[in-house]
Amino acid sequence: MQSSMTMELRPSGDSGSSDVDAEISDGFSPLDTSHRDVADEGSLLRRAEMYQDYMKQVPIPTNRGSLIPFTSWVGLSISMKQLYGQPLHYLTNVLLQRWDQSRFGTDSEEQRLDSIIHPTKAEATIWLVEEIHRLTPSHLHMALLWRSDPMYHSFIDPIFPEK
């Protein structure tokens, strides 16, 4: 079977440009993927709801007080996950990464973070933020965030608390 390819040239939508947009067609109509988008959306909503419901069930550790040395927020969170055997919420992981990124270009960028912020205060801050993230976000908000971030899985911890 022989397929004919056509290319349609049309002026670019930018009126100040002399560029031309090209659309290539193989002569077949595009597949209707709207049903897949709706199914994916429903699946994402269900996953977000299950995730948020699960995170609400995980208790914040009460026996804390270890002095954990750390050079970055993400590094501290990794140590906390190992020490307490608990996951941190997606939103907490994203926030901690952003806090680390916010140090880029500062005078203290190369300085150990535990020499700037006392380890006990830093850990308490993470647990306070974690409690907010476990108890308050809606699964609808989570699904919207996940839909906009194709790599959202990388911020979801695979650690499950031991009971």
Swiss-Prot record:
<comment type="function">
    <text>Regulator of RNA-directed DNA methylation (RdDM). Binds to single-stranded methyl DNA. Involved in the assembly of RNA polymerase V (Pol V) transcription initiation or elongation complexes at the chromatin, as a component of the DDR complex.</text>
</comment>
<dbReference type="GO" id="GO:0005634">
    <property type="term" value="C:nucleus"/>
</dbReference>
<dbReference type="Pfam" id="PF09187">
    <property type="entry name" value="RdDM_RDM1"/>
</dbReference>
<dbReference type="GO" id="GO:0000419">
    <property type="term" value="C:RNA polymerase V complex"/>
</dbReference>
<comment type="subunit">
    <text>Homodimer. Interacts with AGO4, RPB205 and DRM2. Part of the chromatin-remodeling complex (DDR complex) that contains at least DRD1, DMS3 and RDM1. The DDR complex recruits/activates the RNA polymerases V and acts during siRNA-directed DNA methylation (RdDM).</text>
</comment>
<protein>
    <recommendedName>
        <fullName>Protein RDM1</fullName>
    </recommendedName>
</protein>
<feature type="region of interest" description="Disordered">
    <location>
        <begin position="1"/>
        <end position="36"/>
    </location>
</feature>
<dbReference type="InterPro" id="IPR036319">
    <property type="entry name" value="RDM1_sf"/>
</dbReference>
<dbReference type="GO" id="GO:0080188">
    <property type="term" value="P:gene silencing by siRNA-directed DNA methylation"/>
</dbReference>
<dbReference type="GO" id="GO:0003677">
    <property type="term" value="F:DNA binding"/>
</dbReference>
<keyword id="KW-0238">DNA-binding</keyword>
<keyword id="KW-0539">Nucleus</keyword>
<dbReference type="InterPro" id="IPR015270">
    <property type="entry name" value="RDM1_plant"/>
</dbReference>
<dbReference type="GO" id="GO:0005654">
    <property type="term" value="C:nucleoplasm"/>
</dbReference>
<dbReference type="GO" id="GO:0030422">
    <property type="term" value="P:siRNA processing"/>
</dbReference>
